[in-house]
Amino acid sequence: MRKYELMYIIRTDVEQEVVQSTVEKFQAIITNGGGEISKHDLMGKRRLAYEINKFRDGHYVLVHFNAEPAVVAELDRVMKISDEVIRHLIVKDVA
């Protein structure tokens, strides 16, 4: 398994329950694929550096996890089609 870092931004016009269910959905994809989450940080609502899809703010989430590349591909696929996610980035963690 490889180490990865995931940062994603959830829209601010959704209910808090939707934010929580979105976070749980992505955690489930990692753990159900045999991965393990080493750090999870819901950073809260923050201002974006620039406007993305007419949004100026977003709920930031940072996740450090270990998983196989197939799990990362599935996570990326689901995030691309998720309406709640404004932007996401998955990178290999070197630490």
Model-derived segments and spans:
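Structured, basic alpha/beta domains of bacterial-type, RNA-associated proteins
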Residues: 2-95
